Amino acid sequence: MKKVLWSGVLALAVAVLLALAPAPAQAQMTKVEGKAFDSAYVRDFYLEGNAIPTQKRNTVVLKGADGKHLVFSLLDTSGYSSEIQQKYAGMIIVERKAMVGAAAVGTGAYGLGLVKPTPAEGPAKLIVYDVAGAKVAETATQHDAKLAQPVPLQATTTGGQAKLYLGRYWVEIK
């Protein structure tokens, strides 16, 4: 009888401790700068048989709470076919599963395309391609008309949440 009583008390104590334990933190995103940025920066990106240069000034590296990186960069497609220029705006390298807007993206390297609406104030489409050029995912972007100084590529982090901006168009990164 004592064994059963002590087992019940022990089970209750474990249940109380588990209930009081803090919940797992949401994925906190931070921007990477300095030497860590330089180490993660990729000079050329391979897509559809081409090594396309990236733009360092238009590159963002984010780091999650798990220490895994997400690298976003615009591509310099001048000198490439009009098909490549129209299809790809940038690239993404992810070291873990991530949500880019509503699109789930697995670990790997991808090309990014942006299809802007007419008129320009509406939501655009961000398209994710594998390195062979096949469409992997698509998500809608938001348009931020109030953005004071839009730049070609930037990321903001507020309260651990990240937004990726391509000009005035943005998606949340998780």
Put a short name on every predicted segment.
Residues 1-4:
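Positively charged n-region of N-terminal signal peptides that target proteins for export
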Residues 19-22, 113, 144:
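Amphipathic, positively biased hydrophobic alpha-helical segments used for protein targeting
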Residues 77-130:
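Mid-length scaffold segments of soluble, non-membrane domains
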Residues 10, 66-69, 92:
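Compositionally biased, intrinsically disordered low-complexity regions
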Residues 26-83, 131-174:
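Primarily secretory-pathway and cell-envelope proteins
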